[in-house]
A protein has these predicted regions:
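Surface-exposed molecular-recognition determinants
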Residues: 2-130
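Positively charged, low-complexity/disordered segments
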Residues: 131-135
Length: 135
C-alpha cells in the first residue's frame, strides 16, 4: 500500500529573530480544515493568539481549560480580540517554548462561525485545551 499524506503543508515559516507577529496570507480556500502547529517562546505576561481574515475586533468567543497535574481551572469570554492559544496566568515568570496545535474547522466557509480547538503545553507545568469561535 502506498503512503498517503493526511495533511498537505501549504505554508511554513521559521523566524531568525523575535517577532511580534507572523502573517500567513493567500491560503487557498480549497481545503476543508486547517491545522496550525506552533512552537512559541513566551513569558508569563505574553499571550499567543491569532486572527482569522485579519479580524482583530472583539468578535471571538473562548473557553479555556487548563491544569498542571494536581489542579484544574477554566475561564471563558465572549468578547476577545483574537483567538488566544493561552492566557497569561502561569505559575512561573519564564515559560519557555510552548507547542500549540490548532485545528480550524471549515475555515473557508462564509455561512458559519469559525471554530478552532487549540491544545498546548506551556513549557512549564500547565497543559491546556481551548475551544475558540469567531462570531
Amino acid at each position: 500500500m502506498a503512503d498517503t499524506l493526511t495533511y498537505n503543508i501549504i505554508a511554513t515559516t521559521t523566524l531568525g529573530a523575535n517577532a511580534g507577529s507572523v502573517t500567513f496570507s493567500s491560503i487557498p480556500g480549497t481545503y476543508t480544515d486547517l491545522v496550525l502547529v506552533s512552537n512559541v517562546a513566551t513569558t508569563s505576561s505574553t499571550n499567543f493568539g491569532y486572527y482569522l481574515n485579519n479580524d482583530s475586533a472583539n468578535n471571538y468567543c473562548v473557553v479555556n481549560m487548563y491544569g498542571n497535574g494536581s489542579s484544574t481551572s477554566s475561564a471563558n469570554s465572549t468578547t476577545e480580540g483574537a483567538l488566544w492559544a493561552n492566557w497569561s496566568n502561569y505559575t512561573s515568570t519564564t515559560v519557555g517554548n510552548s507547542i500549540y496545535i490548532s485545528n480550524i474547522q471549515n475555515y473557508a466557509s462564509t455561512s458559519m462561525y469559525k471554530t478552532v480547538i487549540t491544545r498546548g503545553d506551556f513549557g512549564g507545568d500547565r497543559k491546556s485545551t481551548r475551544l475558540n469561535s469567531s462570531h
